Each structure stands twice: as structure tokens, then as C-alpha cells.
Amino acid sequence: MGFLGTGTWILVLVLPIQAFPKPGGSQDKSLHNRELSAERPLNEQIAEAEEDKIKKTYPPENKPGQSNYSFVDNLNLLKAITEKEKIEKERQSIRSSPLDNKLNVEDVDSTKNRKLIDDYDSTKSGLDHKFQDDPDGLHQLDGTPLTAEDIVHKIAARIYEENDRAVFDKIVSKLLNLGLITESQAHTLEDEVAEVLQKLISKEANNYEEDPNKPTSWTENQAGKIPEKVTPMAAIQDGLAKGENDETVSNTLTLTNGLERRTKTYSEDNFEELQYFPNFYALLKSIDSEKEAKEKETLITIMKTLIDFVKMMVKYGTISPEEGVSYLENLDEMIALQTKNKLEKNATDNISKLFPAPSEKSHEETDSTKEEAAKMEKEYGSLKDSTKDDNSNPGGKTDEPKGKTEAYLEAIRKNIEWLKKHDKKGNKEDYDLSKMRDFINKQADAYVEKGILDKEEAEAIKRIYSSL
């Protein structure tokens, strides 16, 4: 009885204690109620949803021990957090770059990958769209890159077809920007292209000699550049004014003229500019003898050299366009008259219809045609020697008669003297002969480096002006 009474009292004391909640328990319940009533952050809700989803997808393995269950739960929680961060980053990237999103959508769109209708056209070569990142066509048909020699020929052909040296500059600048070639390689490429271009023009000149009726690409391009009815000196002045501001046109003309001189296509029909020099043009028309063909080539070569010289002086501001026109007018009159007096006897008879006959005939005019032609051929083949002989005999006293080259040198000297006297602005420094010589020497050396002139040709031009 004593033991039972003691146990009853213990039960009475314990049960009331378990029936009433602890102070901490009431605090947990109120906190739980407060958490239910308050709105939790969206990120926490998303994390819990992802965690529940992962738990359903990957149920934890039934292994004994509470520690195993806690490890799996932690692993799943880490996966859920990682997935959540990944989704959040993707959403931020989509908001920050809508354009990238558009591009991604287009990549997914299968219709964007379809070929154009032109790709299925059998009449198209397909080269226009085959290498869209290669507009210069530096690939073969099978897609393999061209060799260095093929590229040189391709560039030269493009320059020849378009008659524009700017084509080479564009291609080289692109290769330099891409880092495919160096500066030294660019200079080497320029020399090689100039050599191939010279061969192309020589080949075209030979074809033209075989079939004169077949128009060359150069004459076709030049046909539409000069109007039929233009005042001669007005057209020259307009050309000088344009050449002063257009460097591309000047470079193209210089390149073309230099290559033409080297290939010796000296027909006056290929030099439309000469028709604006009436005296000189009439002189050329009067020379139609086959024996005088060499002399005719010499006249055209030197006249073109002088025209280019005037263009360069105007372009670089040495003289104004108006002064250049006056210079060319004086050049046309003086050089034609002096050359007429140097022609052989049979040529003088033909020219007498266009020019008044001189009162006295020099010793050169009485020479035979055969002897004069032989001397002219010798003088033309050695332009350097003729200039040296002229310098060594300033008085003009020589046992042999002067040739046409020396006559032109004399005309150049008189034109320079005339140019110095007709200084409208009174600034004689612009016409200083030493400055002119330096300018011509620099230009000739620059053209040699660019492949526009041969070294021998440049030396001959420099000797012409150094003898002034």
C-alpha cells in the first residue's frame, strides 16, 4: 500500500506538468503563427519549391542512421541553390541584352538557315555567296586559299580591268589590318604586282598591234572621259583643277602613263590629251612615214613627260592651274615650231602646209632621210648620252647635227625661262630651278619604289631636268 501511494503521487505530479506547455513552446507557436501570416521573400519560396521538386524526383535512399538522411538533404539543397542561381543569371542576361536574345532565337529558328533562292539558280556561279567574308576572291573554287603567285596575278588583273590603282591600296590595307602581311611584304607585293601589270599591258599592246581594230580596255575606259566638243585649253584647265584635289585620279594617270611609256604604245590615238595641243597634234599628224616612226615615238614620250611634269607642279601647288594652262599653251607653240625646224627634208615638205616655211634652212634640214633617221635612232636609244653631250656643249657647237631629243631639251630650257619671267605673284622661289630639280628627283625615286617607273627611265627624266 505504501508503494502504491507513492506511485500515485508521482503520476499526479508528472501528468499536470506534461499537460501544460512549456514557456518556450508558447514562444515557438507564436513565432510559427507569425511566419505563416507574414509573406516570405520570393527567392526563399522558389528555393523551397525547387527543393521539393528535387526531393520528389530523387527520393532519398532508405539507409539506417539519421546522419545519412541529413547528408542527402544537404546535397539536394546545394543542387537546388545551384540551379536557382543558374536560372537567375540567365534571366538577367536576357533582360540586359535583348539583341543577343533575338540572335539566339534566330539561331534556333530553322527557317533562318535555309539557302537563298540564288544559291539554287544554276545560272549563278555561286562565287558571290560562297565566301561572303572574302569579297576580294582570295580563294579557289574548292575553297582552298590561293598561292602568293595567284594572288599577285589576281590583284594585277583587277587593277588592269578597273584601271584604278586604288584597288591595290584597298586590298593591301585589308591584309595589313588582318595581320596577314607585314609592311615589308606589302612593298614586295607592290613591286610584284607592278611587274605583272606591266606584262599584262605589254600583252595587250602586242594584241593591239596585231589587230588594230580591236579596242583595248584602256581606250574603252578613256573614250567616255573626254567630251567631243570641248575648248582645248578650257578642258586642260578643268583637268588641272580636278587633278589638284583628286589624288586618286592623279595616281591612276601617273601609273597608266608610266606603264604606257614602258610598253611603247605611242600611237597618238591613245593619248587623247594631245589633241588639245593643236600645234603639236598637227605635227604628229604630219609624221606618217614608217622611217619616222621612231622619231614620232620620241616626240610623244617627251611631250607626255612634260605634260605630267606640269600636272605635278599644279597638284603640289608649285603653280596655279591658270599658270599651268599658260605654260602648256607656250609649250605647245614653242615645242612644235622648234621640232618642225629639226625635221628632215621630206617631213618639212609635209608640214609646210600647216606651218610657214622658215626663211633659212639649217644644216640638219639638208641631211638625207636615211642619215637623219639613223642618228635619231641612236640618240633615242641613248637619252642619257644626248643630255650629257648637250651639257658639255652649252653653245650648241658640234660637228654632228642635233637630234630631236636635244631640240626638246632646248625647248624645255626656254619654257623654264619663260615660266620664271611670267611670275604673276612675284614669288620667284616657287620657280627656283634647284627646287624643281629636287622635286623631280624625289618624284622619280618615289615612282621607282612604287614600280611606276623603271630605274633607267627615272634616271633619264632626272637628267632632262638636271640639264636645265
Swiss-Prot record:
Location in the cell: Cytoplasmic vesicle, Secretory vesicle; Cytoplasmic vesicle, Secretory vesicle membrane; Secreted
Give start-end of the signal peptide: 1-19
Task: Give the membrane topology, semicolon-separated if more than one.
Answer: Peripheral membrane protein
Glycosylation is annotated at: S37, T216, T231, S359
| One GO MF term | RNA binding
Basic and acidic residues composition bias: which ranges?
29-42, 360-406
Residue ranges, annotated region (Disordered): 23-69, 353-406
**The UniProt record lists the keyword Iron-sulfur:** no
Q: Where in the body, by tissue, does this protein show up?
A: Detected in urine (at protein level). Expressed in brain, heart, kidney, liver and skeletal muscle.
Gene Ontology cellular-component annotations: endoplasmic reticulum lumen; extracellular region; secretory granule lumen; secretory granule membrane; transport vesicle membrane
UniProt KW Glycoprotein keyword = yes
State any GO BP term from the record.
protein localization to secretory granule
* Quaternary structure (record): Interacts with CHGA. Interacts with secretogranin II/SCG2. Interacts (via C-terminus) with CPE.
**Biological role:** Member of the granin protein family that regulates the biogenesis of secretory granules. Acts as a sorting receptor for intragranular proteins including chromogranin A/CHGA. May also play a role in angiogenesis. Promotes endothelial proliferation, migration and tube formation through MEK/ERK signaling pathway.
PANTHER family per the record? Answer: SECRETOGRANIN III (PTHR17388), SECRETOGRANIN-3 (PTHR17388:SF2)
Which protein are we looking at?
Secretogranin-3
